[in-house]
Amino acid sequence: MAEYINPNALGDLEENVVSINRVTKVVKGGRRLRFSALVIVGDRNGHVGFGTGKAQEVPEAIRKAVEDAKRHLIKVPTVGTTIPHQVLGVDGGGKVLLKPASEGSGVAAGGSTRPIMELAGIPDVTAKSLGSSTAVNVVRATFDGLKNLKEAKVVAALRGVSLGE
């Protein structure tokens, strides 16, 4: 598991509300209405996290989601302005293919993947969502892919070879 990243040490974190859903629970007396929020936070410098929150009011659900996102920050390795290598992130029915892109090509990603890349500070990347299109599944799959990224020096150390080979 990745080590904990203290959100207070990072300074100013930006927030992006990806989705707000109205959810209901059917009880004997009728329906109970609540709101579910999915939020991305990041410092545009390699740190990004996502969280979910649920409450009877939208602002409270967003506040809970932001707190959850700050508790689940990850560090994203980069090479220049892009990611080190191609990776497939999977979570449930959601699959997201992340590919490095040449400098200046921008973020070619749709839906909930774009704000993740922007708040992580990755200006050049290509992403394709395969499988489930649900916002939560796509976000979880994207984060799975970002967690599986490895820098060249880490891979070289694992293989026991020097970086020049």
UniProtKB/Swiss-Prot annotation:
With S4 and S12 plays an important role in translational accuracy. Part of the 30S ribosomal subunit. Contacts proteins S4 and S8. Residues 13-76 form the S5 DRBM domain. GO terms for biological process: translation. It holds the Pfam family Ribosomal_S5_C. It comes from the Bacteria. The keyword RNA-binding applies. This is Small ribosomal subunit protein uS5. InterPro entries: Ribosomal_Su5_D2-typ_SF, Ribosomal_uS5, Ribosomal_uS5_bac-type, Ribosomal_uS5_C, Ribosomal_uS5_N, Ribosomal_uS5_N_CS, Ribsml_uS5_D2-typ_fold_subgr. Signal peptide: none annotated. Belongs to the universal ribosomal protein uS5 family. The N-terminal domain interacts with the head of the 30S subunit; the C-terminal domain interacts with the body and contacts protein S4. The interaction surface between S4 and S5 is involved in control of translational fidelity. GO terms for molecular function: rRNA binding; structural constituent of ribosome. One of its GO terms (cellular component) is small ribosomal subunit. Keywords: Ribonucleoprotein, Ribosomal protein, RNA-binding, rRNA-binding.
